[in-house]
């Protein structure tokens, strides 16, 4: 999709059996205090990373390269997954992840692996190039409906 003439990639590249295996494979990373729950952990650097996780990273890099490389102003070196981590979003919790962006990252990749069937929510995105008017309720935004298996890749400058 080109939202605001900004390339946002949405795909569902994996089937349910792969997603089931992925969920099973990452359980050890998501236990309280496990490496996958810590922001300083780069999961791509962990030893013995499950093949399903490597496949997710490879697919994100493949799609980013396929759709973003033709849009760049200058030649790019080979792309790679620079940092990976998990986020668990708990509905109705006091703690919320604040709107943020990822500086100069070319592509930010997200995959939703465990999503409630009801009220899954939306990924909200603001493109700061159009001017984010924080005090104005009419600041333009886009929303992407979240569902299991959805992979979203967007430029790092998108506030989400």
Walk through the language-model features, giving the residues of each:
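Non-heme Fe(II)/2-oxoglutarate
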Residues: 1-77, 85, 94-96, 122
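Catalytic core of non-heme Fe(II) oxygenases with the double-stranded beta-helix
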Residues: 80-158
């Amino acid at each position: 999709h080109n939202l605001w003439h900004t390339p946002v990639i949405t795909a569902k590249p994996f089937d349910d059996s792969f997603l089931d295996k992925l969920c099973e494979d990452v359980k050890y990373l998501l236990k309280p205090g496990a490496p996958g729950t810590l922001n300083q952990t780069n999961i791509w650097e962990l030893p013995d990373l499950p093949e399903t996780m490597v496949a997710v990273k490879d697919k994100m890099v493949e799609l980013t390269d396929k759709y973003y490389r033709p849009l760049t102003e200058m030649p790019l070196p080979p792309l790679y997954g620079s940092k990976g981590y998990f986020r668990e979003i708990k509905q109705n919790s006091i703690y919320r992840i604040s709107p943020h962006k990822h500086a100069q990252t070319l592509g930010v990749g997200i995959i939703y692996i465990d999503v409630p069937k009801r009220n899954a929510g939306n990924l909200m995105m603001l493109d700061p190039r159009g001017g984010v008017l924080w005090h104005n309720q009419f600041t333009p935004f886009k929303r992407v409906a979240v569902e299991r298996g959805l992979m979203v890749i967007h430029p790092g400058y998108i506030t989400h």
